[in-house]
Regions:
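Bacterial N-terminal signal peptides
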Residues: 6-16
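A short beta-strand motif characteristic of beta-propeller blades
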Residues: 37-41, 90-93
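Acidic/hydrophobic-patterned starts of short beta strands in beta-sheet-rich repeat architectures
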Residues: 57-68, 109-116
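Hydrophobic/aromatic beta-strand elements that line small-molecule binding cavities or substrate pockets
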Residues: 49-51, 79-82, 101-103, 132-135
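Structural motif
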Residues: 72-80, 121-127
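Beta-propeller blade termini
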Residues: 44-55, 99-112
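Beta-propeller fold detector
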Residues: 91-98, 144-146
Length: 146
C-alpha cells in the first residue's frame, strides 16, 4: 500500500503536465488550418516553419509559425503566434520577419530567427550574410529585441 501511495503524486504530476501539451503534428495542423482560412487576396499564404514552446513563462505552450506571403513577383515572411486561452489555439498576433529565414527556435521564451540578408555585393536572389533576430511575445504583441 505504501508504494501505491508514493506513486500517486508522481502520476498526478505527469498527468497535469500533459494537459497543456501539443505535439509538433498538432501545431502544424493548427498552422495549416489557419492559413487555409485566410481570405483570398493577391498573395497566397503558406505555413513554412512551426515550433512549440512557452513564450510567456506560464508553463503552457504557444505555437510560433513562420508564414510565407507569396505574391506574383515577391514574397515576405511573418511570425504568427497562436495561444490557447482555454478554447483551443487561436491566432493571437503577428510580426514581420526579415531576410530569407533559415530557422526558428524558442530559447528561454525568446523566439530566435536565423536569416540570410543581402551583403553589399550580393544579387537580390542570393543573400549571404547571416543575421540572428530575437523576438519576445509580450502583451499580445511580437516585439523585436534590439
Amino acid at each position: 500500500m505504501r508504494i501505491t501511495l508514493a506513486v500517486i503524486p508522481v502520476f498526478m504530476l505527469l498527468l497535469s503536465s500533459q494537459t497543456h501539451a501539443v505535439t509538433q503534428a498538432q501545431a502544424e495542423k493548427i498552422a495549416s488550418d489557419y492559413v487555409s482560412s485566410l481570405p483570398p487576396a493577391d498573395v497566397s499564404y503558406e505555413a513554412t516553419k512551426t515550433v512549440v514552446g512557452d513564450l510567456d513563462g506560464d508553463g503552457k505552450p504557444e505555437i510560433v509559425v513562420q508564414t510565407a506571403l507569396l505574391g506574383p513577383t515577391y514574397w515576405s515572411y511573418r511570425l504568427d503566434v497562436f495561444v490557447d486561452r482555454g478554447k483551443g489555439f487561436m491566432h493571437a498576433g503577428s510580426g514581420d520577419l526579415w531576410g530569407e529565414v533559415q530557422s526558428i527556435a524558442i530559447d528561454k521564451g525568446i523566439v530566435v530567427v536565423k536569416s540570410k540578408m543581402p551583403g553589399p555585393n550580393d544579387p537580390r536572389c542570393c543573400p549571404t550574410l547571416d543575421k540572428t533576430y530575437r523576438y519576445r511575445w509580450q502583451g499580445g504583441k511580437v516585439i523585436e529585441l534590439k
